[in-house]
Amino acid sequence: MTLQLPGFAVLMLLQSCSAYKLVCYYTNWSQYREGNGSCFPDALDHSLCTHIIYSFANISNNKLSTSEWNDVTLYGMLNTLKTRNPRLKTLLSVGGWSFGSERFSRIVSNAKSRKTFVQSVAPFLRTYGFDGLDLAWLYPGPKDKQHFTTLIKELKAEFTKEVQPGTEKLLLSAAVSAGKVTLDSGYDVAQIAQHLDFINLMTYDFHGTWRHTTGHHSPLFRGQQDTGPDRFSNVDYGVGYMLRLGAPTNKLVMGIPTFGKSFTLASSENQVGAPITGSGLPGRYTKEKGTLAYYEICDFLRGAEVHRILGQQVPFATKGNQWVGYDDPESVKNKVKYLKNKQLAGAMVWAVDLDDFRGSFCGHNVHFPLTNAIKEALAVA
C-alpha cells in the first residue's frame, strides 16, 4: 500500500521535517498581463510556498505606501491564503527596479527621513496582515553601504520593540545581488546578515546583451569558456562568495528563476558563446524584450531544438534566430540538490506569476510546475 499525500500534507511534512524555506515572489504588475498571462494573488496555491513576498510597495513622503491603485484589495487576496494554511508567512517587498537606487539613497542617508520610514513600516504591515518586510534595494552603491546596514539595524530594533504579547515579531529579509562587483561595492554582508531573518540571493541575470554573445543567465557552475570576470557569473560562485563574506548558511536562500533570458542570433551559429545582435523577441504576455516567462518558454519549445549545457546543468533552446537560456524541472532539481549539499536555508523563486500558474501551457495540467519541482526536491530526504 502506498500513501498518497495531498499537496498540503506534503507542505506540512516539508515545514515540520525540515527547516527549508521556499520563498516565492509575486509581482503586482502581473495582474495587467493580457488573457492567460494575468495573475492575481487568488491564483496562488496556499500550500506551495513557506513564504510569499508581495512585490512591490512604494515609499511616499518617506513612509511605506502602496504602489498600485488596487494594492489593498490584492493584499487581502494574498493574506486570505493564510486562513487555509496558517503556517504560511507573507512579506511585503519595498523597492524594485522601477523604484530606483537613488530614491533609496536619499531616504536612508538622512537620519530624519530614515527614522520616518522605519517607524512607518510596522503599522503598515500590521494593518494589512503581513508578517514582515523585504528590502529590494537594487542596488546600494559604495556610498550607501553603511547606510544600508544602519537601515537594517534600525528596522530590526523597531520590530523588536514593536512586538506585543500574543503576536509574532515581524520578519525582515532582503533581496541581495549575487554579482561580485555589486556585492563588493554595496553590501557589508557579515553585518546585515546578523540582523536579517533571511537573505534572498538573486542568483540569476548573470548574462545579458552586454556580453554580445549567447550565454545562460543562471548557470549552476562556471562554463568552460568563462574567463576573467565571467568566471564569477554562476550560481556556485555567487553562493560561495556570499558565504565567504560572512552570510550564515542558515539564513541564505538561493534564488531560482522561473523566467529565461533570450537573444537574437547574428548568424547560424547557435551554441553557447555564439554572436548576437541584441535581445530576443518579447513574449506574447510579458512583452519585454530579452525575457520570457516559463509559460512562454513552454510555447517556444514547440518546434525548438533543446540543448543541455552539461557542465553548467541548465538547458537552452533555439528556434530560427532566437536563443533562450532557462530553467526546467531537471535543472531546478539539480539546483535544490546543490543548495541542500551547501546546507542553505532554502530556495527563492522569482516569480510565481512567471511559472505556469494556470497549468495550461507546459502540459500535464500541472500548476506551477517549476515551483512544485523545487518543493518536491526540498522535501526529498
UniProtKB/Swiss-Prot annotation:
Belongs to the glycosyl hydrolase 18 family. SMART domains: Glyco_18 (SM00636). Residues 1-19 form the signal peptide. Chitin binds at E68, W69, G95, G96, W97, S98, Y139, M202, T203, Y204, D205, W350. Carbohydrate-binding lectin with a preference for chitin. Has no chitinase activity. May play a role in tissue remodeling and in the capacity of cells to respond to and cope with changes in their environment. Plays a role in T-helper cell type 2 (Th2) inflammatory response and IL-13-induced inflammation, regulating allergen sensitization, inflammatory cell apoptosis, dendritic cell accumulation and M2 macrophage differentiation. Facilitates invasion of pathogenic enteric bacteria into colonic mucosa and lymphoid organs. Gene3D superfamilies: 3.10.50.10, Glycosidases. Residues 322-336 are annotated as: Important for AKT1 activation and IL8 production. The lineage of its organism: Eukaryota, Metazoa, Chordata, Craniata, Vertebrata. Its main location: secreted. Disulfide bonds join C24-C49, C298-C362. It is found in: Secreted, Extracellular space; Cytoplasm; Cytoplasm, Perinuclear region; Endoplasmic reticulum. Monomer. Pfam families: Glyco_hydro_18. GO terms for molecular function: carbohydrate binding; chitin binding. Glycans are attached at N28, N36, N58. Keywords: Antimicrobial, Apoptosis, Cytoplasm, Disulfide bond, Endoplasmic reticulum, Glycoprotein, Inflammatory response, Lectin, Secreted, Signal. Residues 20-381 form the GH18 domain. GO terms for biological process: activation of NF-kappaB-inducing kinase activity; apoptotic process; carbohydrate metabolic process; cellular response to interleukin-1; cellular response to tumor necrosis factor; chitin catabolic process; inflammatory response; lung development. This is Chitinase-3-like protein 1. It comes from the Eukaryota. GO terms for cellular component: cytoplasm; endoplasmic reticulum; extracellular region; extracellular space; perinuclear region of cytoplasm.
